[in-house]
Amino acid sequence: MENYVELKIHDMSTTLHPADAYALVLEEVEGGRKLPIIIGRQEAQAIKVMMVKYLPPRPLTHDLFPMLTKHLGAVLKKILIYKAKDGVFYSYLCFDKDGEEFKIDSRTSDAVALALRYECPMYTTEDIMQSEHLHDLGEGKFSVPISSVSMQMLEEALQAAIDKEEYEQASQLRDEIRKRKERME
């Protein structure tokens, strides 16, 4: 696949702030760059169940989708994370039905949960990988691009920076918040 980067799951964090947020970290298959994606609690659970190979006594919501598409004759061939904007990642579910390919827009967390169930590959574009990957600061610390952080997390980080009197960081966060609000108008 030209200009695409194949991904695998590297890890998932425990709870972040806000309390129901998790960091799903995807890693390129051939290389070391990592892509952090903030997801909700239910989506994290749907992914974690597959990561630990737990078989629930009854199907979860994400388990129903493969059963349904199989019955309808469609197969998920891959997922593609095609866009990242203001901390939100956008993905396609790429299907094949009787030799015809079609795609459906999806939240990235749902796309990853389904890719695990279908055992199909996950991709992103090289542009997204370049702009959104974690930067290794050494000593087990990483820096996340400000563009990949949600508005809520930016506002909380701004308040924390002000409280700690870290005014240079606060001004960068304030500028990013303003820029995003202007784009929304």
Which positions does each model-derived feature cover?
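Divalent-cation
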Residues: 2-151, 156, 162-163, 171, ...
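Extended, charge-rich alpha-helical interface modules
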Residues: 182-185
